Amino acid sequence: MAVPNTFAGATTAIPLSQLDSNFNTPITIGNTAVQLGNTITTLNVMTLNAPTVTNYVESVVPIGTVTSSYTLNLSTGTVLTATLTASTACAFTMPAAVAGKSFVLLLKQAPVTGGGSATFTGVKWPSAGTPTITTTAGRMDILTFVSDGTNWYGSYTQGYTP
């Protein structure tokens, strides 16, 4: 059976649960060809107005152990995990400020030694001030950052046991 590949006149949603797993006929949304069914499709440079997203999971990017400096990179995800080197201060360099961009950094202490510290260049913190990173071995602080296009604004919660 031929499957139509134009939905320009559609007035209601098409429930994905009713699509056959072999429904891989490309359709065009804007300038992007999309295939439905058991495929993964990446939509680039597309504006969606008032979408509803369900069952959304962000990619977690394991940075690993950081030493005296590290430049944060958001190209592969916006939930980052890093472990501080024992008794070492790490200076984190922020990515370029893009309006509406945000990310979370799960910052852990080394499991046995702890004692690492961190600073973040160019971040505006709330009235409580710049965080003093939890130094207890094995503990974790969660730092959240959001940008207005000019600045990065940071907030934090501390002392978690992962």
What are these regions (language model features)?
Residues L48-F120, K124, R139-D141, V146-P162:
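Exposed extracellular interaction/assembly regions and N-terminal maturation sites
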Residues A33, I40, V45-A50, V79:
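Detector for repetitive beta-architecture
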Residues F92-T93, T130-T134:
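Beta-strand-rich interaction surfaces with strong enrichment in secreted/lumenal proteins
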Residues A8-G9, T135-A137:
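Short, ordered beta-strand-loop transition motifs
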Residues V3, A10, S68-Y70, G129:
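Glycine-rich, flexible loop/turn motifs
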Residues M1-L36, T41-T42, T161:
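Extracellular "spike/adhesin" assembly and maturation modules
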